[in-house]
Amino acid sequence: MKESEDLASIIQMELDKRLNTPNRGVKQAGFYVLIGASMPNVLVEVGFLSNPMEEKKLKQNMYKQQIAEAIYSAIKHFKQTREKVLAGE
């Protein structure tokens, strides 16, 4: 779904702006949890607990807040863009 890919790219861009983490890019796969959804959907992975440095970051409240704000900002941007497209602007 093109919209899902667009949303994923915007989320990745926002995460890149706010976090000092490796950009592993946007990938597509038939994730079971996303199959059958009728709306744009993405699976966001922001780190791996198997990586000690990432685990340490994921335990920090400020880091989790930055992740949440990045995702919120991306969804807001995506929604505003879609509304303009649907309105013919």
Residue ranges: model-predicted function:
Residues 1-89:
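Active-site-proximal helix/loop segments of hydrolytic enzymes
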